[in-house]
Amino acid sequence: MRMMKNNNNETVTVIGIDHGYGNMKTATRCFPSGVARYDKEPIFQNNLLVYNGMYYQIGEEHKEFCAEKTQDEDYYVLTLAAIAKELDGKGMNRAKVHIAAGLPLTWVATQKEDFQKYLLQNERVDFTFRNKEYHVEFAGADIYPQGFAATFYRLQDFKGINMLADIGNGTMNIMYINNSRPLEKKCFTEKYGTHQCVLAVRESLLKELGTVVDDLVIEQVIRTGTADIGEKYLTVIRKAAGDYTKEIFHKLREREYNPELRRLYVVGGGSCMIQNFGEYDKSRVTIVRDICATAKGYEAMTVRKIQRNGGMLV
């Protein structure tokens, strides 16, 4: 979150938000991108958001994959929660907010305008989150290519020919960056993320051991490489995750990845799969484990845009 004065001398709060299928991320916060809607006030209210007369439990479960993030109200409600978390971190509950967000690389051209309108559907909004009232006015919304934003602070490192893989919960975005310049015609989006890995592991457990294991356990092994479970279960999960990670590298090779000819940069929450289960030359592959890197990049790009238009940080 960055406080700025725009060229009209208005104070605006820039908040970068990464609308993931698995997690919502801001520059300083990360929470599951699940929404459960209730007509009446629910019993448990730890992450309750009240908006427009409805009750929403935030972070109950992951958001299912959808080709368009504007197809329901979930991401709007999650956006309000993300804004509230950032404002609360600064002891604020009122602001004029400029959203910096993004979409998968190959979706930006066709969905950018609709997503921008979706985020700005209200000029101002009053809502309650975790028993605290918020009053937000919207100053604007910028939409950037997902993945590329995560490299914003380190573009100078992209000398020569490079491939960027942004592995999220629902998609993997692939981009070529040559001599610090992204190649627009070399951008691809694959439906190949950590959620699909969980499904593959779940199927292996059922096939090999006839057992259903909670997704939270599977996700922990994917994220950390281990969990407090029996060795036979751990072995099957690791094997399935390793096989899935090999498929990720196969997808990259289909997009002309050759480790001897280009460096690979891996970002996003799914980068843990590469780190924990991948077979690769560590001198040729860089893994960026900051799950908030993309949100930070969105935020930084909007700050730069406002500065170029005569604004300044305050």
Task: State the predicted function of each range.
Residues 1-164, 181-196, 208, 216-314:
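Nucleotide/phosphate-binding catalytic cleft detector across ATP-hydrolyzing
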Residues 202-208:
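Acidic, metal/cofactor-coordinating or nucleic-acid-engaging core segments within structured domains
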Residues 167-173:
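Ser/Thr-glycine-rich phosphate-binding loops at phosphate-binding pockets of nucleotides
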Residues 26, 174-176:
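Conserved blade-register residue in beta-propeller folds
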